[in-house]
UniProtKB/Swiss-Prot annotation:
This is Endogenous retrovirus group K member 24 Gag polyprotein. Residues 165-264, 598-641 are annotated as: Disordered. Pfam families: Gag_p10, Gag_p24, Gag_p24_C, zf-CCHC, zf-CCHC_5. InterPro entries: B_retro_matrix, B_retro_matrix_sf, Gag_p24_C, Primate_lentivir_Gag_pol-like, Retrov_capsid_C, Retrov_capsid_N, Retrovr_matrix, Znf_CCHC. The lineage of its organism: Eukaryota, Metazoa, Chordata, Craniata, Vertebrata. Myristoylation is essential for retroviral assembly. Alteration of the glycine residue leads to a block in the budding of particles and an accumulation of Gag inside the cell. Specific enzymatic cleavages may yield mature proteins. Residues 624-640 have a biased composition (Low complexity). Keywords: Cell membrane, ERV, Lipoprotein, Membrane, Metal-binding, Myristate, Repeat, Transposable element, Zinc, Zinc-finger. One of its GO terms (biological process) is viral translational frameshifting. A lipid is attached at G2 (N-myristoyl glycine). GO terms for molecular function: nucleic acid binding; structural molecule activity; zinc ion binding. A zinc finger (CCHC-type) spans 544-561, 580-597. The gene is ERVK-24. The products of the Gag polyproteins of infectious retroviruses perform highly complex orchestrated tasks during the assembly, budding, maturation, and infection stages of the viral replication cycle. During viral assembly, the proteins form membrane associations and self-associations that ultimately result in budding of an immature virion from the infected cell. Gag precursors also function during viral assembly to selectively bind and package two plus strands of genomic RNA. Endogenous Gag proteins may have kept, lost or modified their original function during evolution.
């Protein structure tokens, strides 16, 4: 690694010294170790980098791209390499490139003479390098302390040592002239090369203003203080120079201004002078004009309609809000209302907002509801007394009289307000892709849904389906009670039709339903059911009376009086505990007289009586009498019935049985 560092240091010795001096002049200190590490990485991933170095900004941008690609492939690029690369890239931006080329005519006059003499003897490549010597500029020129200016001039401005003259002069307020109109005098060194110690020598002098690019004709001039209440820039305190213009990105006072965007400003200025307002479009602003301009003296000042452009950030926020949250989300509605009521939007502005924010299907919905709202508004304008002179072409921004931006900018305030109301109403009717707007009658509160969420869904559906505001309010108040769950209905019922005038009905309903469905509400309902406590103006108790004491609130089996009597009777009748298990059920230690079991320990059902008698034989009933059985062959020798019963009675188990009446008769 040591040989590699020494090799890199010897290979890029001159280029490294130039970079270090350049960065030091700009107030940035970079160690030689970090620069060598940077060029090691460059030599590894950018083998095309020239040994003598380069001042071309495109080459350093290419280095950054290739280092990023190497990082994506898994190669480790130290953080110090990225920092040093960014600093060097920023330092080389003022140098000559194809994108930011500077002509030779913009250089000082004395430099042009020497340059023209040398270009006759050298090639075109050497000439370009000479041009760079005069127009190159170090970055961050404010930091001028601890710098060897003689060494810096030899490296960056070698030809300036040949020039003779005084040092840089500070231009006072009275001598301020644009740098683009007159070249720098011969022998004058750029202000960025002069130490700031000269400024600190005389502390009693008032502060002076430096000259910066752009030239005076392209600099921003604040409007003067208006007599109609529009404040201008406050004047500078007495005894001080005017406020200096802020420095631009180019800090070299000898370099010409950047031409980036200047063509656009020239076109806009030209169009303003010619009266073409389409070149500087977007929301209209009304500014008062002095009495002498467009109005006679003594008359109130007239207003002038001017267009101001929407910011790109506003359009970007609209697009991202519609994409992430939907066109009718609370965020988008708030943002759209702020834009609609904060600007004087004409029909063309609404179309631009819708096209840039909505999808094609959503824009088609917006346009459809816009046209529908315009037709309804035109009917109202004609039916008004007196009729309002606002037609459909004006509200849509079409037709011969209202198709251009300049024509729409002159619309009256009443038409602007109607366009705003129609477009906001059309925006509210936009549906998200794949979703259909339900009927307000089908929106019902869930059993566990909070009441405010239910009301919000109901209002959203009603706003999309009902156009009239008064009818929408009545429907929402009605459905907020009818479609609520039973718990919320019971809480709202005492308030229905009794809300005082001037109060919001929905707000009172939400207050009444606050806390329903929570743990506290459930505990209160349980306590109410047990004790009959008044809750919400209602008393919930058992419907019947106790058959024992006649009181309301409990049944007979739970009557405290009856339970107290039973305990007293049991204590008086039974003086001792039962000795063993119940002889009836065999399951518990209690007396048989107090046994209430329906089954015994084996699961057999128990009768209601305590003792049972002897089992009885079932009696046969029928239409035919019972005939005794006589074997065949003995039918004629049947003994009389009395003999049969006498033989039976002689048996020991039937000694005491009386004879039947039929046997006695025989």
């Amino acid at each position: 690694m040591g040989q590699t560092k020494s090799k890199i240091k010897s290979k890029y010795a001159s280029y490294l010294s130039f970079i270090k001096i350049l960065l030091k002049r700009g107030g940035v200190k970079v160690s030689t170790k970090n620069l060598i590490k940077l060029f090691q990485i460059i030599e590894q991933f950018c083998p095309w980098f020239p040994e003598q170095g380069t001042l071309d900004l495109k080459d350093w941008k290419r280095i950054g791209k290739e280092l990023k690609q190497a990082g994506r492939k898994g190669n480790i690029i130290p953080l110090t390499v990225w920092n040093d690369w960014a600093i060097i890239k920023a330092a080389l931006e003022p140098f000559q490139t194809e994108e930011d080329s500077v002509s030779v005519s913009d250089a000082p006059g004395s430099c042009l003479i020497d340059c023209n003499e040398k270009t006759r003897k050298k090639s075109q490549k050497e000439t370009e390098s000479l041009h760079c010597e005069y127009v190159a500029e170090p970055v961050m020129a404010q930091s001028t302390q601890n710098v060897d200016y003689n060494q810096l001039q030899e490296v960056i401005y070698p030809e300036t040592l040949k020039l003779e003259g005084k040092g840089p002069e500070l231009v006072g307020p009275s001598e301020s002239k644009p740098r683009g109109t007159s070249p720098l005098p011969a022998g004058q060194v750029p202000v960025t090369l002069q130490p700031q110690k000269q400024v600190k020598e005389n502390k009693t002098q008032p502060p002076v203003a430096y000259q910066y690019w752009p030239p005076a004709e392209l600099q921003y001039r604040p409007p003067p203080e208006s007599q109609y209440g529009y404040p201008g820039m406050p004047p500078a305190p007495q005894g001080r120079a005017p406020y200096p213009q802020p420095p631009t990105r180019r800090l070299n006072p000898t370099a010409p201004p950047s031409r980036q965007g200047s063509e656009l400003h020239e076109i806009i200025d030209k169009s303003r002078k010619e009266g073409d307002t389409e070149a500087w479009q977007f929301p209209v602003t009304l500014e008062p004009m002095p009495p002498g301009e467009g109005a006679q003296e003594g008359e109130p000042p007239t207003v002038e309609a001017r267009y101001k452009s929407f910011s790109i950030k506003m359009l970007k926020d609209m697009k991202e809000g519609v994409k992430q949250y939907g066109p009718n989300s609370p965020y988008m509605r708030t943002l759209l209302d702020s834009i609609a009521y904060g600007h004087r939007l004409i029909p063309y502005d609404w179309e631009i907002l819708a096209k840039s924010s909505l999808s094609p299907s959503q824009f088609l919905q917006f346009k459809t509801w816009w046209i529908d709202g315009v037709q309804e508004q035109v009917r109202r304008n004609r039916a008004a007394n007196p009729p309002v002179n606002i037609d459909a072409d004006q509200l849509l921004g079409i037709g011969q009289n209202w198709s251009t931006i300049s024509q729409q900018a002159l619309m009256q305030n009443e038409a602007i307000e109607q366009v705003r109301a129609i477009c906001l109403r059309a925006w509210e009717k936009i549906q998200d892709p794949g979703s259909a707007c339900p009927s307000f009658n089908t929106v019902r509160q869930g059993s566990k849904e909070p009441y405010p969420d239910f009301v919000a869904r109901l209002q959203d559906v009603a706003q999309k389906s009902i156009a009239d505001e008064k009818a929408r309010k009545v429907i929402v108040e009605l459905m907020a009670y009818e479609n609520a769950n039973p718990e919320c209905q019971s809480a709202i019922k005492p308030l229905k039709g009794k809300v005082p005038a001037g109060s919001d009905v929905i707000s009172e309903y939400v207050k009444a339903c606050d806390g329903i469905g929570g743990a506290m509400h459930k505990a209160m309902l349980m306590a109410q059911a047990i004790t009959g406590v008044v809750l919400g103006g209602q008393v919930r108790t058992f419907g019947g009376k106790c058959y024992n004491c006649g009181q309301i609130g409990h049944l007979k089996k739970n009557c405290p009086v009856l339970n107290k009597q039973n305990i007293t009777i049991q204590a008086t009748t039974t003086g001792r505990e039962p000795p063993d298990l119940c002889p009836r059920c065999k399951k518990g230690k209690h007396w048989a007289s107090q046994c209430r079991s329906k089954f015994d320990k084996n699961g057999q059902p128990l009768s209601g009586n305590e003792q049972r008698g002897q089992p009885q034989a079932p009696q046969q009933t029928g239409a035919f009498p019972i005939q005794p059985f006589v074997p065949q062959g003995f039918q004629g020798q049947q003994p009389p019935l009395s003999q049969v019963f006498q033989g039976i009675s002689q048996l020991p188990q039937y000694n005491n049985c009386p004879l039947p009446q039929a046997a006695v008769q025989q």
